[in-house]
Amino acid sequence: MEQWDHFHNQQEDTDSCSESVKFDARSMTALLPPNPKNSPSLQEKLKSFKAALIALYLLVFAVLIPLIGIVAAQLLKWETKNCSVSSTNANDITQSLTGKGNDSEEEMRFQEVFMEHMSNMEKRIQHILDMEANLMDTEHFQNFSMTTDQRFNDILLQLSTLFSSVQGHGNAIDEISKSLISLNTTLLDLQLNIENLNGKIQENTFKQQEEISKLEERVYNVSAEIMAMKEEQVHLEQEIKGEVKVLNNITNDLRLKDWEHSQTLRNITLIQGPPGPPGEKGDRGPTGESGPRGFPGPIGPPGLKGDRGAIGFPGSRGLPGYAGRPGNSGPKGQKGEKGSGNTLTPFTKVRLVGGSGPHEGRVEILHSGQWGTICDDRWEVRVGQVVCRSLGYPGVQAVHKAAHFGQGTGPIWLNEVFCFGRESSIEECKIRQWGTRACSHSEDAGVTCTL
């Protein structure tokens, strides 16, 4: 019995060594969830994912099948060795059992029963091994299918969330593109409006500049005419004062002669006879001429102070008065800093060339170290007055155009100079630009100043 138990344990050990791993592809594909019907793109992605998963399974099977074959061969070799050992042990037992009585029938029956029992035990062991392998395979594949199903569901959930987020981002991008298109259209409209507004503003500014230039010309002309009228008024006032003085002298002489004649008439005495009878009243004669104005009577007493009248309009600006007497010399100032030692004599930037004297000639101006002429466009009295005043003359007598004092040889520096007549030099007037090519030296301007 001990040998029987030892043989039975060895048989169980040899059967337990023959274990193998089997994979069922149909069960795996059956456990996969159906295709989701979200959108064509998602279905295509899922199909591609399925194909990749199947390819991965095939690759795993292609790698594992040779390994399983090699392991099975090794196991078969080891199993055959164990089986040969167990068979030798069994033969030894049978020989030991049958050695006592080869001719007895009980031994034959025992051998037959033993063989049947051994075959039944082998069938049961094989059935148990098959059941164990199937159970292990089903549990392994169930766990694997559950994990793969869970992972696949997670992947589907992630894909659905990703697809929803992509759709949300796509909708946001569409809205942003629409807003950008509307913003672009509004910007284009705004740009067109700005361009139209700029064009209108430029037209209005150009018109206003033309109107301002016309008004400036009118103001210049009016100011020149006013200055000329003021000068004429001064001359007329001086002439009228002289005439009034002459008339006063004449009236005084006439009054003196009249008084002398009246005195001589009073001294003449005539012999008169007796008065005759009064004659008839004659007709009224014509009104005689008014007599000479009598001498002014004595100044009467001052009257009462009247009420203060309303403030009158401001009068015109009077002529500049004569220079006053020089004041007393002030206190001595502080000692200044030492200079560089170079003394520069002041020089004028305007000169008159080609005239009969220094007070008249062609006007030339110094610019950039070179003397040049001035074109006679808009050359008027007020510009000549500024030129004469800058040269130290009291006023202008006449302005000349068309190279009256001859043509110059240098560059033509200025053209269309605008002055009010109150500037101290021609550089303070309105100058468009230095250097012009729109004129020639046949249009050089000149001036004659008053002495």
From Swiss-Prot:
Residues 273-341 form the Collagen-like domain. Residues 350-450 form the SRCR domain. Disulfide bonds join 375-439, 388-449, 419-429. This is Macrophage scavenger receptor types I and II. GO terms for molecular function: amyloid-beta binding; cargo receptor activity; low-density lipoprotein particle binding; scavenger receptor activity. It is linked to Prostate cancer: A malignancy originating in tissues of the prostate. Most prostate cancers are adenocarcinomas that develop in the acini of the prostatic ducts. Other rare histopathologic types of prostate cancer that occur in approximately 5% of patients include small cell carcinoma, mucinous carcinoma, prostatic ductal carcinoma, transitional cell carcinoma, squamous cell carcinoma, basal cell carcinoma, adenoid cystic carcinoma (basaloid), signet-ring cell carcinoma and neuroendocrine carcinoma. Barrett esophagus: A condition characterized by a metaplastic change in which normal esophageal squamous epithelium is replaced by a columnar and intestinal-type epithelium. Patients with Barrett esophagus have an increased risk of esophageal adenocarcinoma. The main cause of Barrett esophagus is gastroesophageal reflux. The retrograde movement of acid and bile salts from the stomach into the esophagus causes prolonged injury to the esophageal epithelium and induces chronic esophagitis, which in turn is believed to trigger the pathologic changes. Residues 77-451 are extracellular. Residues 77-109 are annotated as: Spacer. InterPro entries: Collagen, SR-AI/II, SRCR, SRCR-like_dom_sf. The chain crosses the membrane at residues 51-76. The keyword Disulfide bond applies. Homotrimer. Interacts with MYO18A. The modification Phosphoserine is found at residue 27.
